[in-house]
Amino acid sequence: MGVPKQRWTPEEEAALKAGVAKHGPGKWRTILRDSDFSALLRLRSNVDLKDKWRNLSVTAGGYGSREKARMALKKGRRVVPKLTAEPMDVDEKDMDNAHDTVIDVEPLAMAFEPLPFLESPDKSVARLDDLIVEAIRKLNEPSGSNKAVISGYIEDQYWPPADFQYLLSTKLKSLVNSGKLIKVNQKYRIAPSSSLGGISTKVSSSEGMNTENNNVKRLTKPQVVAELEKMKGMTREEAAAFAAKAVAEAEVAMAEAEEAARVAEAAENDAEAAKAFLDAVILSMRNRNAASMILRAC
């Protein structure tokens, strides 16, 4: 059993409201790291802050989430994925009186209804594609981002549905199988020639990838050594251009390796299926021959 949650104190609520006023809703980890609020909120997690802020906003609005959603549909208002607020300066006096004030913002029941996940299945899939790509690009980790990090980013910035983890796992697998994402050591990166994010080219086969990247020069080890010698006399701009070129070549090589691995795995599966079929045919023929010999003996 986990440690029971402590009731929120007025000081903690004041710190939460001031943190939202300073950094904006959804920036729970930033608020927890802020030295102005970390001491008061040291016993709280980002999930605690998110849940408490939702409850405060629903109470301030005077309606529950279902009533607000129904009103929004009647008015034809579009549900926005994220609530933003203008940053403001906060001093100690404001901190003391913050728990007695209510921030004039739209209740989270409307602002954080599950994105366009509720619009239709087709739109939810397309929207989740965009969120995954946004997370990977904003995180910008050199070796890629794992599922937990991607999930944490989306949950911090948006309000996902209850089955979000299942949807995320399914969509990540689909994007990897389609060649739009590259998965290495449980981490995901955007494929160099993927169609995600407005790039028109798409990785569909090793032949197509070779055609699209045939203008990239492949260097042997002696050529690499020679290029490194040349870099000693390069200007800063020339060195940056050379480094960008080397990164592009490395990404292409990794994408080709991933594609080759997928092709090899598919070939192995086909070979196993063919062998199983052959074994079944041989067994059937043996049984038939044995039956024929028994009939002849009789």
Curated annotation (Swiss-Prot):
Domain HTH myb-type residue range list: 1-61
Subunit structure of this chain's protein: Forms a homodimer and heterodimers.
Role summary: Binds preferentially double-stranded telomeric repeats, but may also bind to the single telomeric strand.
Keyword annotations: Chromosome, Coiled coil, DNA-binding, Nucleus, Telomere, Transcription, Transcription regulation
Recorded family membership: Belongs to the histone H1/H5 family. SMH subfamily.
Upper classification of the organism: Eukaryota, Viridiplantae, Streptophyta, Embryophyta, Tracheophyta
Gene coding for it: SMH2
UniProt xrefs under Pfam families: Linker_histone (PF00538), Myb_DNA-binding (PF00249)
Coiled-coil regions, chain positions: 237-278
UniProt GO cellular component terms: chromatin; chromosome, telomeric region; nucleolus; nucleosome; nucleus
InterPro entries (alphabetical): Histone_H1/H5_H15 (IPR005818), Homeodomain-like_sf (IPR009057), Myb_dom (IPR017930), SANT/Myb (IPR001005), SMH1-6 (IPR044597), WH-like_DNA-bd_sf (IPR036388), WH_DNA-bd_sf (IPR036390)
UniProt comment concerning the protein's domains: HTH myb-type domain confers double-stranded telomeric DNA-binding while the H15 domain is involved in non-specific DNA-protein interaction and multimerization.
DNA bind region: 28-57
GO MF annotation: an example: single-stranded telomeric DNA binding
UniProt-annotated location(s): Nucleus; Chromosome; Nucleus, Nucleolus; Chromosome, Telomere
Positions of the H15 domain: 124-192
Protein name stated in the entry: Single myb histone 2
Keyword Coiled coil: yes
TM spans (from-to): none
GO biological process entries: nucleosome assembly
